[in-house]
């Protein structure tokens, strides 16, 4: 232990005495903060949730980057990969055609499959 500093075990003990809980959130890989003009993305995130007096605070460490917002008029639809693969497998069409069919069917895979097989 370095003179004048506490080791991590001692720090955790003192925090517990003060009613502060610290929890590592190991399953988090990415954190995104959505802003008005930009999004702030933290990849390979290490997140710690600290709870004190009923208030939860998050500490995030990782690779930071900013991304500009996409144009609102150019909103691109995205569909779950499972839905796209299902349409492709059931109808034998290419990926682009499956996505077009999902767009026409408002994202409903069953309707997209019916539309493609009835043509």
Curated annotation (Swiss-Prot):
Q: What Pfam families does the record point to? A: NAC
* InterPro entries from the UniProt entry: NAC_A/B_dom_sf (IPR038187), NAC_arc (IPR005231), Nas_poly-pep-assoc_cplx_dom (IPR002715), UBA-like_sf (IPR009060)
GO molecular function annotation = RNA binding
The record's keywords, sorted A to Z, are: Protein transport, RNA-binding, Transport
* Xref: SUPFAM superfamilies: UBA-like
**Assembly with partners or alone:** Homodimer. Interacts with the ribosome. Binds ribosomal RNA.
Q: Which NCBIfam families match?
A: archaeal-type nascent polypeptide-associated complex protein
Q: What is this protein called?
A: Nascent polypeptide-associated complex protein
This protein's species is Thermoplasma volcanium (strain ATCC 51530 / DSM 4299 / JCM 9571 / NBRC 15438 / GSS1)
| Name of the gene this protein is made from | nac
């Amino acid at each position: 232990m370095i003179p004048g500093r506490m080791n991590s075990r001692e720090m955790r003990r003192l925090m517990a005495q003060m009613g502060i809980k610290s929890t590592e959130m190991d399953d988090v890989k990415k954190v995104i903060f959505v802003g008005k003009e930009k999004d702030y993305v933290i990849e390979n995130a290490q997140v710690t949730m600290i709870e004190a007096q009923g208030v939860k605070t998050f500490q995030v460490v990782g690779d930071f980057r900013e991304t500009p917002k996409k144009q609102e008029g150019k909103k691109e639809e995205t569909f779950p990969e499972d839905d796209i693969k299902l349409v492709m497998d059931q109808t034998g069409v290419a990926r682009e055609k499956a996505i077009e069919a999902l767009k026409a069917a408002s994202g409903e895979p069953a309707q997209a499959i019916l539309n493609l097989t009835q043509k």
